[in-house]
């Protein structure tokens, strides 16, 4: 049975190393991590910052999504994921996920599935602010 060691929606900085340490397991032959970073350009425009807002149910939705992916996994020891909300600057992590598994294929596959599931179904909204003074909402679910 796969352990869910973190499923957090937070306004505090998140770090891959912390998630990797959480999922570390003596029986795991692989740990795979993912960091979704705030980049400095989008659509050819310079990005100043992003602001993530979330539906009131988002923390529970995230917990449910991580548990769902964990339950579907095979050969996976532990998973952890966190998503930021609030104001994020270029270079900060918006989404962090880590998976410990018996073998690399399960670790890579489960981590990719976890990230894609969160991106597709978590009710968060991204508001981008650009260097040219414009802004836009992106990726509403």
Curated annotation (Swiss-Prot):
GO (cellular component) term, any one: cytosol
Keyword Endoplasmic reticulum belongs to the record: no
Keyword Transferase listed: yes
Pfam families assigned to the protein according to its UniProt record, in alphabetical order: MoaE
Gene Ontology process terms (BP): Mo-molybdopterin cofactor biosynthetic process
Cited SUPFAM superfamilies: Molybdopterin synthase subunit MoaE
One Gene Ontology molecular-function label: molybdopterin synthase activity
Pathway(s) the chain acts in: Cofactor biosynthesis; molybdopterin biosynthesis
EC number: 2.8.1.12
Listed InterPro entries: MoaE_sf, Mopterin_biosynth_MoaE
Residues the entry annotates as binding substrate: 37-39, 103-104, 119, 126-128
Keywords annotated in UniProt: Molybdenum cofactor biosynthesis, Transferase
Reaction equations catalysed: 2 [molybdopterin-synthase sulfur-carrier protein]-C-terminal-Gly-aminoethanethioate + cyclic pyranopterin phosphate + H2O = molybdopterin + 2 [molybdopterin-synthase sulfur-carrier protein]-C-terminal Gly-Gly + 2 H(+)
Known partners and oligomeric status: Heterotetramer of 2 MoaD subunits and 2 MoaE subunits. Also stable as homodimer. The enzyme changes between these two forms during catalysis.
Family classification: Belongs to the MoaE family.
Cited function: Converts molybdopterin precursor Z into molybdopterin. This requires the incorporation of two sulfur atoms into precursor Z to generate a dithiolene group. The sulfur is provided by MoaD.
PANTHER family: MOLYBDOPTERIN SYNTHASE RELATED
Protein name in the entry: Molybdopterin synthase catalytic subunit 2
Annotated organism of origin: Mycobacterium tuberculosis (strain ATCC 25618 / H37Rv)
């Amino acid at each position: 049975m796969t352990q869910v060691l973190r499923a957090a929606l937070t306004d505090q900085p998140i770090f891959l190393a912390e998630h990797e340490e959480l999922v570390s397991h003596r029986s795991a032959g692989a740990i795979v991590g993912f960091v979704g970073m705030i980049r400095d350009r989008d659509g050819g425009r310079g990005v100043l910052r992003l602001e993530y807002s979330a539906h009131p149910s988002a923390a529970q939705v995230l917990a449910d999504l991580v548990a769902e992916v964990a339950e579907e996994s095979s050969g996976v020891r532990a998973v952890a994921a966190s998503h930021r909300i609030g104001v994020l600057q270029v270079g900060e992590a918006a989404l962090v996920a880590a998976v410990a598994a018996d073998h690399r294929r399960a670790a890579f596959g489960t981590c990719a599935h976890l990230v894609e599931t969160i991106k597709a179904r978590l009710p968060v909204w991204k508001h981008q602010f650009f260097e040219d003074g414009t802004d836009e909402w992106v990726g509403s679910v």
